[in-house]
Each structure stands twice: as structure tokens, then as C-alpha cells.
């Protein structure tokens, strides 16, 4: 038996080597792209963008809009993820597919759909009253449309992994359904909540297509960091675009790691 185990392990070596090579190639590509940006950028480029009033505004708007979007995404993702995990109903597969649409649709299509919704339907009156399209609310709504889908998917997976037994025990001990949810389910799902919040914030930070179409790219109004990269490239300032890109990478890594 020991000899056969040794032979089996030797025979498994090519399999694992192949996996490591493929994984290393992918990870290496990501690292190479980041290192290329770092090699190209200079400290003076960062000084230049941080001294730019427009870039400072985009940093501020990005942080605020991503934070608001994350709260809204969790507010929606918690009940939706719980319902999709715990309750069986007719048409569930269809609803599940609809929830994935923002993930699979091209970002520009999402932005265009939002623009049509608020400019070519009865919701136009709401847009005229509140000033949504091409204003800051459009930035948040565009981010929310995509980030919430990732949050829903994450929390549904979290609730799927939680055994309903503890919840049932709480119900038998006299808790109402809402009390069991708040006192038992949510505390157990705290890591999933943190993961969903982190993913929603980071995804919102990198959102560009829907914002460009639905909110525009106006300086000092709807300019977030991805839009800043676009505008800097449009005027031929590659150094500034790379510096802003690395700033976004740093912010995303900080959120994901911390």
C-alpha cells in the first residue's frame, strides 16, 4: 500500500504542475500589468494629480458615492439573498436569472437602459423633479445597479451555507421570525456581509460604462476616478491617467485587504 501511494503521488505530479503553470500565468499577467504601471509612473505624476482640484473632487465623490452605494446594495442584498436561499417558489429560476442580468450585461447597456428609463418613460417626471440623470444621483444609481448584483450573489451563497437549524431552534424557543433573523441569522452571516460590502465598494469604485452614459463625464459634477482616467486620456495626459489608475488600485487593495 505504501508503495502504491508513492507511485500515485508521483503520477499526480504532472497534473499539479499543469495547474500551477496555468495559475502562475494568470497571476503573473495581473502582476505584470501592475508592475508596468508602477514602472511608468513617477512620484511627480502623483504630486500633479493630487494638486489638481478636479482630481481631488473625483476622489471625494468616489469615496462618498461608493460608500452610499455599498449601504444601499446591502440593504437590498440581505433580504433578496435570504429569500432566494430559504424560500422555494414558482418562477425562482427566472428571478435568479434576472438578478444576474447586471453581471452579464455590457456596462454601457446598463447605463443606456437607465438613461432611457429616466428620460423616455413616465419616470421622466421624477428625473425632472429630483435631477437624477447627469447629476450625482445618477452616479450612485449606476454604481448600485451593478454592485448590488454582486452583493446579492455573495449573500445568497452565505445564507446557503448557513444551516437553518439554529434559526429553527430560536423559533421553538419563542423568537419571532424577525427576531430569529436579526439575532441568529445575521450574526452568523457577518463574514458574508463583510465580503459583500467589500466587493460592492470595490466594484463601485471601478464602475465606468454606466456612469459615462447615465451620469456623463462633467468635471466638478459627475467625475469619479474612472471618469478621471478617461478624461486624462482624452487630453493626452497618459502620465496623469496612469497615476489615477494606480491610485484606484491602491484604494481597492486597501479595502479588499483591510
What are these regions (language model features)?
Residues 173-174, 187:
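Glycine/proline-centered hinge or cleavage motifs at structural transition points of membrane proteins
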Residues 1-13:
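Short, Lys/Arg-rich, polar N-terminal cytosolic tail immediately upstream
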Residues 101, 165-173, 241:
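Short hydrophobic faces within alpha-helices
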Amino acid at each position: 500500500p505504501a508503495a502504491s501511494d508513492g507511485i500515485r503521488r508521483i503520477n499526480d505530479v504532472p497534473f499539479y504542475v499543469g495547474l500551477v503553470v496555468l495559475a502562475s500565468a494568470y497571476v503573473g499577467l495581473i502582476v505584470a500589468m501592475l508592475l508596468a504601471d508602477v514602472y511608468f509612473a513617477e512620484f511627480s505624476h502623483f504630486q500633479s494629480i493630487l494638486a489638481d482640484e478636479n482630481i481631488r473632487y473625483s476622489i471625494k465623490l468616489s469615496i462618498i458615492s461608493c460608500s452610499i452605494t455599498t449601504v444601499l446594495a446591502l440593504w437590498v442584498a440581505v433580504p433578496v439573498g435570504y429569500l432566494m436561499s430559504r424560500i422555494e417558489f414558482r418562477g425562482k429560476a427566472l428571478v435568479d436569472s434576472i438578478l444576474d442580468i447586471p453581471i452579464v450585461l455590457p456596462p454601457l447597456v446598463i447605463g443606456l437602459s437607465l438613461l432611457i428609463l429616466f428620460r423616455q418613460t413616465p419616470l421622466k417626471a421624477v428625473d425632472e423633479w429630483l435631477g437624477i440623470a447627469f447629476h450625482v444621483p445618477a452616479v450612485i444609481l449606476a454604481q448600485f445597479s451593478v454592485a448590488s448584483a454582486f452583493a446579492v450573489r455573495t449573500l445568497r451563497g452565505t445564507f446557503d451555507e448557513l444551516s437553518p437549524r439554529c434559526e429553527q431552534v430560536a423559533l421553538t424557543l419563542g423568537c419571532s421570525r424577525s427576531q430569529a433573523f436579526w439575532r441568529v441569522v445575521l450574526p452568523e452571516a457577518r463574514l458574508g456581509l463583510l465580503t459583500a460590502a467589500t466587493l460592492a465598494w470595490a466594484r463601485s469604485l471601478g464602475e465606468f460604462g454606466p456612469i459615462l452614459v447615465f451620469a456623463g463625464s462633467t468635471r466638478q459634477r459627475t467625475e469619479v476616478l474612472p471618469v478621471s482616467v478617461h478624461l486624462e486620456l482624452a487630453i493626452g495626459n497618459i502620465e496623469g491617467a496612469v497615476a489615477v489608475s494606480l491610485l484606484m488600485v491602491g484604494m481597492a487593495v486597501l479595502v479588499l485587504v483591510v
